[in-house]
């Protein structure tokens, strides 16, 4: 096996750099939209191994990415904890907001076992994936998952969760610890089922001040990493604290993750400094893929020029948007791999 992504995570420089995209199995692909219709609901798609395998493999068949990422959602963890969860068109995920008292009644024992369909998807994907393609599992970071559990939906600045944390510090700390423990079990099961590496998505870390970032983002992720490595000491783990800004510095060392996922707001000069301490992943603005043309080419070239001589997995700085034209995705891949656009 020649798993380029794993080599980079381990600190090697691979040229051209391996490439995959967050949300690469998604609505920009016509084949995904067809499979999504068959599934009925979004959650049914996540929990139906045959269909989840199909959408996981679709971008690999079409583009030959160097990594496949398990098709699922970060909110299957609170769903397994017994929280009601539904996805509505145009509204995204919706849940009944959890209150402080309910947190003390959350039962975490055996919760990860309720996600067996996800592990079956991992097993089936690994069987069908080309040997040279890395299979990534993932979970949401406790802070980001907690924001949805508290507000009941996504909010622009996660004010409900921040206010909850200030008002109910004990309950909030318990929620983060519970989510960290269940998420660690969840990742352990994914690794056992055949995932080559895992990514922890902290999509809302950028709304916190420095003290809260340390307590709500770094400590819970470090707890996950420690628990995963107690079972799989060599586990390769990617951390993606989107929007962390200057607080990216020290994140790898404090949490124990191997590779840093960078969002598109991270200056390339700062990204290059972060790369000196280990592998980085990112960080093209997803809207450059929507725009195409010179905007896309210039964005790709700038990243390759600044970081291509070190350990880099080329990716977007967040998930690809449904509006992205397929031909622009191919143009990006060709440019990264040195072909003509």
From Swiss-Prot:
Protein name: Uroporphyrinogen decarboxylase
Name of one Pfam family that matches: URO-D
Pathway the protein contributes to: Porphyrin-containing compound metabolism; protoporphyrin-IX biosynthesis; coproporphyrinogen-III from 5-aminolevulinate: step 4/4
Gene from which this protein is expressed: hemE
Keyword Cell division assigned: no
EC number, UniProt record: 4.1.1.37
Binding locations of substrate: 23-27, 42, 73, 148, 203, 318
Key words of the record: Cytoplasm, Decarboxylase, Lyase, Porphyrin biosynthesis
Function: Catalyzes the decarboxylation of four acetate groups of uroporphyrinogen-III to yield coproporphyrinogen-III.
């Amino acid at each position: 096996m020649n798993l380029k992504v794993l080599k980079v995570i381990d600190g090697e420089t691979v040229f051209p750099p391996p490439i995959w995209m967050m949300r690469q199995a998604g609505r920009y692909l016509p084949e995904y939209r067809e499979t999504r219709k068959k599934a009925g609901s979004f959650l049914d798609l996540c929990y139906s191994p045959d269909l989840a395998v199909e959408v996981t493999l679709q971008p690999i068949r079409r583009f030959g990415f160097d990594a496949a990422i398990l098709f699922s959602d970060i909110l299957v963890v609170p769903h397994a904890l017994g929280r009601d969860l539904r996805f509505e068109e145009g509204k995204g995920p919706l849940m009944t907001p959890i209150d402080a008292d309910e947190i003390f009644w959350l039962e975490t024992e055996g919760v990860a076992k309720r996600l067996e369909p996800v592990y079956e998807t991992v097993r089936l994907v690994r069987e069908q994936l080309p040997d040279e393609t890395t299979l990534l599992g993932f979970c949401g970071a406790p802070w980001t998952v907690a924001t949805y559990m508290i507000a009941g939906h996504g909010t622009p600045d996660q004010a409900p969760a921040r206010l909850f944390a200030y008002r109910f510090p004990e309950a909030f700390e318990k929620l983060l610890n519970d989510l960290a423990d269940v998420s660690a079990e969840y990742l352990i099961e994914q690794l056992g089922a055949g995932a080559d590496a895992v990514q922890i998505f902290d999509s809302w870390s950028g709304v916190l001040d420095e003290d809260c970032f340390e307590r709500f983002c770094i400590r819970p992720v470090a707890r996950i990493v420690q628990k995963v490595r107690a079972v799989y000491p060599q586990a390769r783990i990617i951390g993606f604290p989107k929007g962390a800004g200057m607080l990216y510095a020290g994140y790898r060392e404090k949490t124990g993750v191997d590779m840093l996922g960078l969002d598109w707001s991270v200056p390339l000069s700062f990204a290059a400094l972060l790369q000196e301490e280990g592998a980085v992943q990112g960080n093209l603005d997803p809207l450059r893929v929507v725009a195409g043309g010179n905007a896309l080419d210039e964005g790709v070239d700038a990243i390759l020029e600044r970081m291509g001589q070190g350990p880099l997995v080329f990716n977007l700085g967040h998930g690809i948007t449904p509006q992205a034209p397929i031909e622009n995705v191919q143009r990006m891949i060709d440019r990264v791999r040195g072909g003509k656009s």
